[in-house]
């Protein structure tokens, strides 16, 4: 099987965490709010890049060992090197959508949280069957063996980062669950 080079996800769904766990050299920091910051050069395809041709995107991909990506059309071109992040549990998906707004509050001017939640479900339903490799983050807080689903070589740094991320984000998930009634 070919190496993972693209982590495909929607904002808020732990894409930068999964990217970092695949390639620790891109890690910059874990913020007190639980957001993973990665090397900014790997974020190019996290936003709409209609200004880039497919060739530009291919050149960008070839310059990096892994990228964090929200462009499913481009990722599909490289589907054998793509890991898609999904979330089949609606309560967890709602949390991850809300988490996106926590880090990017300006997005509320473009799309409501309810619309983002719906758009994630539609996006996931449409794109998931097109990718052979995916990881469902529904059990990221409850599955003690979650990291084994990534099929990566683990070391102490990766395990510590994951556990630190999980500790911060699990608390905010439990707060979300309590206030949302889901």
Language-model segments: which ranges?
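PAPS-dependent sulfotransferase catalytic core
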Residues: 1-64
